[in-house]
Amino acid sequence: MQDWTPREHYTAEDLVEIIRILRDGENGCPWDKVQTHASIRKNFLEETCEALEAIDADDPVMMQEELGDVLMQVVFHTVIEEERGRFDMEKVCREVCEKLVFRHPNIFASSAAENAGINSWDALKNKEKGRTTLALSLIHISEPTRPLY
């Protein structure tokens, strides 16, 4: 059993620590500690679809819950990678922060000179990745959500 003091306010760091505790090989939750990327892949997709349903419904209570579930999935997958020694939450956050700065040269002066003349998010994304992303080409993003499987 893990000592844990309930808090009035939780942070993203608390969420990471809770997932680490649940996955602890000795004292963790039997279900959580055996999960892999493949075994919880469907959960990630389901939680994402539920978050989109909440957004479509413009329901703030539902959005708060479902966005939390998506965040938990991101942290769960990240902790699996942390256990493998490949990356951790700090690296995930650094990656997305660097990406946002790079793709907003009109806002962040440090990236303005490097990206002068490129004025669209997609063009900056393609420059950054060196390719065009096709992930959303299979999804009708303008339509209300529906199961993808």
What are these regions (language model features)?
Residues M1-E26:
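Charged, compositionally biased N-terminal leader segments and the immediate start
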Residues T5-A12, V34-R41, P60-L67, R86, ...:
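Amphipathic, non-membrane alpha-helical segments in soluble helical-bundle scaffolds
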Residues I21-E50, A54-D59:
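Active-site flanking loop/helix segments enriched in acidic
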Residues F44-L52, D56-E82, E90-C97:
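An amphipathic alpha-helical micro-motif enriched in hydrophobic residues
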Residues A113-L134:
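N-terminal cationic and glycine-rich segments that engage phosphates or anionic surfaces
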Residues I139-Y149:
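Single conserved hydrophobic/aromatic residue that forms the stacking wall/gate
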